[in-house]
């Protein structure tokens, strides 16, 4: 009964207005009140401020400044093996695995369409049919900048308007085509591992999605698909990003989906749904790589804290 009510609210509540209100409040300078809200947030979600370049919460003029806080350079070591693609974000793996022709796993027993995720762009979808994917959820406690898994040349960016459903265990199980319905920004790159898409997905209360090359992509929310393209390789006007480099950020959280072409990369064997991710740790390896790559083990306390903060974890599950 409670789950039915929560699910009904996802359809009834004015999600766009709630998101606008949250974005407005998070951008306001309110002095001691801003610091109080940040302090309560840090305590509730067990945010590790020792990792931040500015660990003192008084240093942040707005909640947004705190939310997109940069980390110290030494806290996310980058795996520099050229055959290894690294995790793009701190968070938790929602799902990962093979793309079965046009089907991507959303939750156990629930698929959604690759072509729908890519806003009906069948030519782009053809690049990734029978390839692989990884979906990473960023919880409120996480660092909310998104980085490159490998070196890449930006070729295309598409803004897709959509719903703003919350992303959690309940919606993943009950909202069909959740990620293909929500607002999102699709970024297509040429890489040495073939084409790669990195998709930033919005949700309720996600105030904005930004990229390093264009700034704020949304808002404004104009209700139309927008598309930008860039030249390849060393051509004038091309945009190259390096492995581990920041490519975008969320002001309030959400989800990153990576798509990889068939026959190019192999996802790390030990990763599974609810695996905790840290930027710079191995996500996948080139198919011809001879040595396996594994993420560094995390303290159990960190894993428990991440699972407690993640709505992807079913309340009935053992979070320890």
Swiss-Prot record:
The record marks 253-254 as: Cleavage (non-hydrolytic). One of its GO terms (molecular function) is phosphatidylserine decarboxylase activity. It comes from the Bacteria. It is found in: Cell membrane. Is synthesized initially as an inactive proenzyme. Formation of the active enzyme involves a self-maturation process in which the active site pyruvoyl group is generated from an internal serine residue via an autocatalytic post-translational modification. Two non-identical subunits are generated from the proenzyme in this reaction, and the pyruvate is formed at the N-terminus of the alpha chain, which is derived from the carboxyl end of the proenzyme. Residues 290-320 are annotated as: Disordered. The keyword Hydrolase does not apply. GO terms for cellular component: plasma membrane. It holds the Pfam family PS_Dcarbxylase. The active site is at residues 90, 147, 254. Its main location: membrane. GO terms for biological process: phosphatidylethanolamine biosynthetic process. It is a peripheral membrane protein. InterPro entries: PS_Dcarbxylase, PSD-B, PSD_type1_pro. The modification Pyruvic acid (Ser) is found at residue 254. Binds 1 pyruvoyl group covalently per subunit. Pathway: Phospholipid metabolism; phosphatidylethanolamine biosynthesis; phosphatidylethanolamine from CDP-diacylglycerol: step 2/2. Its cofactor is pyruvate. Heterodimer of a large membrane-associated beta subunit and a small pyruvoyl-containing alpha subunit. Catalyzes the formation of phosphatidylethanolamine (PtdEtn) from phosphatidylserine (PtdSer). Belongs to the phosphatidylserine decarboxylase family. PSD-B subfamily. Prokaryotic type I sub-subfamily. This is Phosphatidylserine decarboxylase proenzyme. It comes from Klebsiella pneumoniae subsp. pneumoniae (strain ATCC 700721 / MGH 78578). The lineage of its organism: Bacteria, Pseudomonadati, Pseudomonadota, Gammaproteobacteria, Enterobacterales.
């Amino acid at each position: 009964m409670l789950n039915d009510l929560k699910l009904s609210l996802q359809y009834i509540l004015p999600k766009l207005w709630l998101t606008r209100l949250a974005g407005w409040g998070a951008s306001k300078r309110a002095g001691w009140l801003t610091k109080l809200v940040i302090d309560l947030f840090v305590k509730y979600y067990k945010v590790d401020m020792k990792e931040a370049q500015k660990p003192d919460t008084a240093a942040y003029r707005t909640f947004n400044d705190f939310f997109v806080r940069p980390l110290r350079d030494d806290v996310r070591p980058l795996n520099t093996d050229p055959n290894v693609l690294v995790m793009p974000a701190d968070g938790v793996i929602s799902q990962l695995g093979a793309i079965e022709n046009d089907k991507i796993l959303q939750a156990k027993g629930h698929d959604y369409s690759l072509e729908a995720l890519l806003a009906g762009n069948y030519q782009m979808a053809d690049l990734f049919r029978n390839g692989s994917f990884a979906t990473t959820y960023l919880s409120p406690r996480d660092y909310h900048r998104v980085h490159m898994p490998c070196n890449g040349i930006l070729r295309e960016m598409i803004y897709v308007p959509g719903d703003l459903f919350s992303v959690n265990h309940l919606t993943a199980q009950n909202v069909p085509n959740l990620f293909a319905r929500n607002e999102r920004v699709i970024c297509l790159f040429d890489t040495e591992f073939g084409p790669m898409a990195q998709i930033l997905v919005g949700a309720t209360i996600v105030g904005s999605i930004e990229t390093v090359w264009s700034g704020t992509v949304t808002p404004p929310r104009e209700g139309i698909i927008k598309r930008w393209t860039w030249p390849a390789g060393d051509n004038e006007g091309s945009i190259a990003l390096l492995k581990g480099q920041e490519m975008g950020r969320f002001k309030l959280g959400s989800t990153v989906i990576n798509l990889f072409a068939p026959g190019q990369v192999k996802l790390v064997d030990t990763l599974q749904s609810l695996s905790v991710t840290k930027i710079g740790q191995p996500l996948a390896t080139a198919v011809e790589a001879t040595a396996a790559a594994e993420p560094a083990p995390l303290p159990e306390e960190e894993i428990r804290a991440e699972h407690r903060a993640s709505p992807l974890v079913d309340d009935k599950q053992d979070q320890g």
